[in-house]
Structure formats: C-alpha cells, structure tokens
Amino acid sequence: MAMVVSTWRDPQDEVPGSQGSQASQAPPVPGPPPGAPHTPQTPGQGGPASTPAQTAAGSQGGPGGPGSDKQQQQQHIECVVCGDKSSGKHYGQFTCEGCKSFFKRSVRRNLSYTCRANRNCPIDQHHRNQCQYCRLKKCLKVGMRREAVQRGRMPPTQPTHGQFALTNGDPLNCHSYLSGYISLLLRAEPYPTSRFGSQCMQPNNIMGIENICELAARMLFSAVEWARNIPFFPDLQITDQVALLRLTWSELFVLNAAQCSMPLHVAPLLAAAGLHASPMSADRVVAFMDHIRIFQEQVEKLKALHVDSAEYSCLKAIVLFTSDACGLSDVAHVESLQEKSQCALEEYVRSQYPNQPTRFGKLLLRLPSLRTVSSSVIEQLFFVRLVGKTPIETLIRDMLLSGSSFNWPYMAIQ
C-alpha cells in the first residue's frame, strides 16, 4: 500500500502567504449607508463573498475535506509484517501492536526460533502465531531494526546513525546504515572478551593445561554462538551454515585468540596436546614447533595492529561469509554478505582512523594468512584432551543442529 501520510501537506502550508494575499487584494465591501436599518446578512443575501482562504479553511474542517482524508489514510495503514491494522511506526516500520511486541521481545531476550517446515511459512493476520521463526524473519526482511529495540524509540524519519557502544567502551561514530550493521555484529558476541578468563588478559602468565583447554573451548563456543546471532546467517540454509563454519572455524579461532590476547607458551601447549606423554621423533617435534610458531606469528601480527572490537567483528564476518565453502546453495548471496561486511569495515576505518589511510588494507591482508594455521594442529593442541578423536567439524554440526551451543555435550561451559 502506498504510504502518502508523511508527504501530505495542508493546502495552506503549500504556498505560505498566497491565500492571505488574495484576501487582502479583494476590494472592500462598502458598509450600509448611515441610518439604514441593520439586518443580519447570510450567504446569498448580499453579504460579502467568501474569500478563497475562508473557502479552503471551511472545506478542511468539513467532514469530507482533506483533513478527514488524512485521518482515514492513517487509520487504514496496514502492518507491513502481517497486514493487520497498524498502530504506528515501530522500530522503523508501520506495524501492529502484536508484531511490535513480538519483535521487541525476540530481540531483547535474544530468542532463537526453529521452523518446522521449509522456512517459508505464510505470515498474515491469521497465521502470524504459527511460526515464530518465519515471523521474525519477515520482521527483519521488511526492515524492522534490531538496534532500535536496543536503543529505545527512535524518530521515525531519522536515519540510524550516531554512537553505538563497542565492547571496549569506544564510541562508533558512523553516519550510515553500515554502522548499525557493525553494532549488530558486536551485540552478537555471547559474552565480552574479558569473560574469556582473567588469565587470558595477562600475556606473561603461563596458563595451566586445564585453563588452556577451557579457554579454547570457550573461544570455539564463542565463534559458533556469534555466528548464530549475527544478521543474515540464521536465514541461510542449515547446510550452508554448517559448510561455512566447518571451513572457517579455525580462522575464527585465531581471530578470537588474538582478540583476547591468548598466551601461547610452547611448553603448556605441548602438554595440552599430550605430546609429553609419548615419545616423539625429532622430525615430529620440529614440525609441531613450526606450527606453533606460525600460530604465534599470526596472533602477534594482529595484536600489533591494535585491532579494536568493531574491526574484529567485521573481520570475522568477512572470514565467515566466504564463497569458498563447498556445496553452498546460494553462492551469490553469501558473496553479497561478505561484500557488505567489507564495506562496513572500510567505512568504519575511514571514519575512526582518518590518519591511517593504509589501515584498511593492512587489516584485509591479514586474512589470507590465517589459513596458514592448520586446523588439524589447532585440534591437536587444544581439543584432543576434551573430545578425543571427535572431529571439530562434527562438534560444529551438532551445535548448529541442536539449536544452541550452550548444550553441546562434550564439556560444561560455565
């Protein structure tokens, strides 16, 4: 339905002063001669003719004038989600009270839904309560804004811009819709970096074996849960979600390790991998040490750039939305999401670091080298004590299919 409410204007407001000038130019009507009897005058009985301004004012106040048309238009605006009668503009779109409350509840509680059909259920006035997954999907598709729920009521005609709080307390000052996208990426983090553990934030601290394994599990959990919460990823086919995470989990792990300044001391890593428990050949020791060195180098190079929280979120989204994953059902859509993430990073860097013109390029150049860290080595170093020979790809698939990473059956995350 075409929206004309916001553009309709009162005729008196269209040309200010035009109608008043017409009234002032009308010739004066002579009064009755002195001594003539006073008789009330009514229209059509010799009284002064109505001026255009008076006529317009009278028609607007009448029951059939444009003023009543405006009220009727406002009363007949439909909810863009279900087609019910809209109660106004909520979170960026005209919606009914039911869809407004559903969207607010879903976003504030960070609820996750599952569709029992093919993720294409009809959402109308009579079926809107049958599938919460498809209802929330349609809310987002028509343009309802998650960030508007987090920040409270927003002016209906103002674009989403201003400051968005980062996890490290820095303000995000971007003036476009991409800043809202970054804000959603940040809010998708299941918990802030500081909750990875106090040992993680102390570079000179040598962590014990159990702490290393627990921290690694938290970072893997964080990567999967973050992906489940970011925009557009839950809308992909579950097979595409699994394919993307199975390919990129090790790169996301390295980014998380750099973000939380994970201590990477050789001796505890070798102990966590169980390599002290059995004798190894010299060649195997050298090869393993090389892999640890590569891991350390990638983490240190990222730390040297002083990457902030928003940049890490964009980098992880660029890594995740890769068309290199096998068997994707919609390669073009995944590529568009990667491009969106890259544009968001570029705009953010240009806005926040205007004196570092090469920063955006340096950040992007770090991504290809993340794949030099072998995923099998990460498994051997951090996860063999927890899950034995169970492949990480199997854990990721199980976490996605179970609907929540909080319930993965391999260890208890506090």
From Swiss-Prot:
GO terms for molecular function: DNA binding; DNA-binding transcription factor activity; nuclear receptor activity; protein homodimerization activity; retinoic acid binding; RNA polymerase II cis-regulatory region sequence-specific DNA binding; sequence-specific DNA binding; zinc ion binding. SUPFAM superfamilies: Glucocorticoid receptor-like (DNA-binding domain) (SSF57716), Nuclear receptor ligand-binding domain (SSF48508). Residues 1-72 are annotated as: Disordered. CDD domains: NR_DBD_COUP_TF, NR_LBD_COUP-TF. One of its GO terms (cellular component) is nucleus. Residues 337-414 are annotated as: Important for dimerization. Residues 76-151 bind DNA. The modification Phosphothreonine is found at residue 51. InterPro entries: NHR-like_dom_sf, Nucl_hrmn_rcpt_lig-bd, Nuclear_hormone_rcpt_NR2, Nuclear_hrmn_rcpt, Znf_hrmn_rcpt, Znf_NHR/GATA. It comes from the Eukaryota. Residues 177-403 form the NR LBD domain. Residues 38-54 have a biased composition (Low complexity). Residues 117-414 are annotated as: Interaction with ZFPM2. It is found in: Nucleus. Residues 27-37 have a biased composition (Pro residues). Keywords: Activator, DNA-binding, Metal-binding, Nucleus, Phosphoprotein, Receptor, Transcription, Transcription regulation, Zinc, Zinc-finger. One of its GO terms (biological process) is lymph vessel development. A zinc finger (NR C4-type) spans 79-99, 115-139. Belongs to the nuclear hormone receptor family. NR2 subfamily. Interacts with SQSTM1. Binds DNA as a dimer; homodimer or heterodimer with NR2F6. Interacts with NCOA1, NCOA2, NCOA3 and PPARGC1A. Interacts with ZFPM2. This is COUP transcription factor 2. The gene is Nr2f2.
